[in-house]
Amino acid sequence: MDIKLLPRRLSSDSENSLSISKETQSIRARRHNILVACFLLVVLSFVGISAFLFWTPYSESLRKSTPISHDNAIEGEEQLVEGILEPLALDPWDPQMSLNGLPTAHFRDNLKADVKYITSWPGAGWTNDVMTYANMIYLGFITDRIPVVPMFTPSHINIGATAPVPSLAFGEVFDLPRMRNLTGKAILEWRDVKDTESEAVDDIGCWNIWEAVQYREHYPRRSSAPEHLKLDISYTKAPAWVKLIPDFEHDPHATFWSLARLAFPQALHDNLVTPLPSPLHGTSLPPDTQMLCYDYMYYVCAQQPYEYDTDYSPAWRYVAQYMHWVPSIQNLANIYLNRAFGVPEDEPTPPYIAIHVRHYDFVDQCKVPIEECFATIPVIARRVREMQDQILEEKGIVVNHVIMTSDEKQETWWQEVADQNWSTPDHSRTKELYGDWYPVFIDAAIQSGGIGFVGTEGSTMSIMAKRRVEAWQGGITKMVKWGYVGADDH
């Protein structure tokens, strides 16, 4: 019997599997084709862009117009660089950004209509005036006003001078471009605003703070700065509430925020009294609303009198710590230090401890004989030895150099200093070479540059040196107490 083999019939499940397999292969084929097409497109795009970029005329232009990196740069005028016009990078804190232009004969002609300013005047010794200006600048920061800093006037420097000592611009002592960048704020000098050669007298109204916070002098605080600036001022007495301790005759401090109130329209409107006529023109003017000014701002604090030596002091934290010396003064200080230490002038200054002893006007505060009032050299030497040990322990630095700065005149006292093998800056020709201001500037820079500092309790010069050494050098500081025998025992 013949048997015929017939083709095997697939089940429906097998047919379905075969169909799915064919579809899968078709999908994979399409996906592969798409990927190949994408890859070819990318390659072609890359080739095209490369050809465009490296086409000589365009690539040269692109390279030439690459922006130049500049901190705090903003868009401004254009400059020509290798034939290509570029935006000129400007410093946003440059004085002319806050003014109409170069200094003018009348200060108002240089003020921008949409900008508000603040100023005040010096009225004491140089260090106190430094604090005064820092206070004024801080008040400008919290009232959104641009500080305009006057010059330093030689109220104390003139004493004993053989000829009149000229005033000196703030920016000749402190590095203002650096300060502006560190604070991120615009800070002007009066020489930026008004031409220093101008003989034009400007009328202005200012607040009289001094008469509101003390009860002995019944007039605004006196200063020679307005005369130098050719300003004729009409003063308005500030309200009594600006005083930190109401009706307390032994302290003349105002507070920052009470003075800040007077910078705004409501307090100005509510506290206007009849202004004093100006001394030259006899003009009576209310306090100026664009160039806000106060007669004297040394005695201003946030919370307590004489707070510069506190860790929270806002005038120090936000302003004064950024007031670094101009390079010329710092370089002079380094030269004087190296000479005193017997080190070549072109070598790095070795680590040192600076001392500041103030005697001159503190004599008036002594209630015992002078020889019992001030700390003796052995007492100061004890502080120095303790500081040397502390620096070695905490920083691993051996400090062999100690330098003394002081206003003391007695030769026997200076001989005691020499007997300690301490150095002193040689100021025998400083005034002749650099001017009457420079012994003070060089001493202050020396005091601020050490790894350690020993100062005089209550001296503003010592307080500022102490803060600078701590902030700038990470140094160790001590203040020597005085007033009676054993005052600094510890």
Indicate where each model-derived feature is located:
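Amphipathic alpha-helical interaction motifs in eukaryotic regulatory proteins
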Residues: A134-I137, A381, R385, S448, ...
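A donor-sugar binding/catalytic signature common to diverse glycosyltransferases
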Residues: V440-A487
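Short, aromatic/basic amphipathic alpha-helical patches
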Residues: A163-F170, E411-W422, M464, R468
